Amino acid sequence: MKLISFGIHLPMMGFVRGEATSREQIISFAQKAEELGYDSLSVNDHIVFRTGWLDAISSLSAIAAVTNRIKIGTSILNIVIRNPVICAKALSTIDILSAGRLFVGLGPGSSKGDYDACGVPFEDRWKRFSEALEVIHALWNERGEPDSQLLDYDGKYYRLKGARNDPKPYQKPRPPIMIASWGSEQGLRRVAKYGDGWMASAYNITPVKFREKWMLLLNYRREMNKNVESFENSLMTMFGYIDNDKEKVQ
């Protein structure tokens, strides 16, 4: 197992208003990332945005078909506005189609515009997110029960009666789940409870603060009697523009 791995983000959006990345760009980018030896390739998620933005799950399906080794996943997918039941089905399918190469980064997102467009109250996002995580865990059936096991779930925001998600993901018991958090105590406790790892962002954290938050997170895991040895972290960094021509970069 590698001590550190490197992933790269698929160029989901265009840099001209109204335009998105083309099919040819997406496919060539994914194949080049695999050729160069990157460990993972990820997509993120917006429904409405100021520029063209490709759909996350559809894009994963496309790159799964043109790659063979590289892991593919989300960083992050908004399971609140998308609905966790639909996400569980779609992500199970991606894991099967990619022969078990999927990792799942989940969060409620921070774009109020996405919530408004989808008719979901923005102020409820964190409570809905915790319930949505419980629904996905249950639908992916980590208790070793038969695939025919029906699920009942009675939450404040999500209610299921006799539900079933078949087929289950390719990976057993399921794809790894990374939970996004800016690093608040409540957020880190949510990561510790529901995640296989923490997906942090370089937007708002320094290396020193990252280590402090990581130590806190491991302590929360221990308090919950959860494994810390296999618990992972990831850091999403800022993108940059590189060219020999200074004017082009600017």
At which residue positions do the language-model features occur?
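N-terminal beta1-alpha1-beta2 module of alpha/beta enzyme domains
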Residues: M1-V66, P173-P175
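Active-site beta-loop-alpha junctions enriched in small/polar residues
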Residues: H9-M13, H46, L77-I79, G107-S111, ...
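Glycine-rich, aromatic-flanked loop segments that form ligand/cofactor-binding clefts
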Residues: M224-V249
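Alpha-helix-loop-beta-strand connector modules within alpha/beta enzyme cores
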Residues: W53-T74, R128-L139, E223
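Hydrophobic faces of well-ordered beta-strands that scaffold small-molecule active sites
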Residues: F6-L10, L41-V43, K71-S75, L102-L106, ...
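Conserved, mostly hydrophobic/aromatic
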Residues: A33, G37, D45, I63, ...
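Active-site-adjacent beta->alpha loops and helix N-cap segments on the catalytic face
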Residues: G52-S58, N204-Y220
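Internal, glycine-rich beta/alpha segment that forms the wall or movable "lid"
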Residues: K2-I4, V80-Y194, E229
